[in-house]
Amino acid sequence: MIRVLLADDQQLIREALAALLGLEVDLQIVGQVGSGDEVLGAVALLKPDVVLLDVQMPGTLLTDGIEAAAALRDAGAVSESGEPVRTLIVTTFGRPGYVRRALEAGASGFVVKDTGARQLAEAIRRVHAGLRVVDPSLAADSLVTGASPLTEREAQVLREAASGGTA
């Protein structure tokens, strides 16, 4: 069972995500928070495997999900199983600059809120397994707009996928 904490300032979004992800037999929503400042305390208390973080959330110390991801990484946050807590950014603001910042902050993935429920559940599973997940269109934009947060191998795979090939 993958233990998931949801962090989004919009209650309707949090509750909808909890309801949809709760239908997955291998995912357990262990908590929900509405601000960046609540993330560290909730992680320390609930010890989730994966934290879904919105980019823009209110807070005085941690004002966005990217800062929260960095704080969790820097604190060495661990899950109930003793593994490092992994973070997945889920946001409306799908900009290449955010993608780079998130990955530099230690986030394991970045997807937009337009992502379907099944794809989001799969992204959580992949992040939990230690893989990096980046929305394909954002990854492609990142390649075009400057320094890429992708490794050379990831960029090669993306180029192959975009051209219809396999790597």
Pin down the residues of each PLM region.
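Short amphipathic alpha-helix used as the core "switch/output" element in two-component signaling
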Residues: 41, 63-83
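Receiver (REC) domain active-site loop signature in two-component systems and cognate sites
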Residues: 57-59
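Short, flexible helix-to-coil linker/hinge segments that flank and couple to helix-turn-helix
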Residues: 97-158
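Two-component signal transduction core modules
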Residues: 32, 51, 87, 110-111
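Conserved acidic segment of CheY-like receiver
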Residues: 1-13, 17-21
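Active-site residues of response regulator receiver
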Residues: 54-55, 91
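Acidic, metal-coordinating helix/loop segments flanking the phosphotransfer/catalytic sites
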Residues: 32-50
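Conserved active-site segment of CheY-like receiver
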Residues: 9, 90-94, 113-115
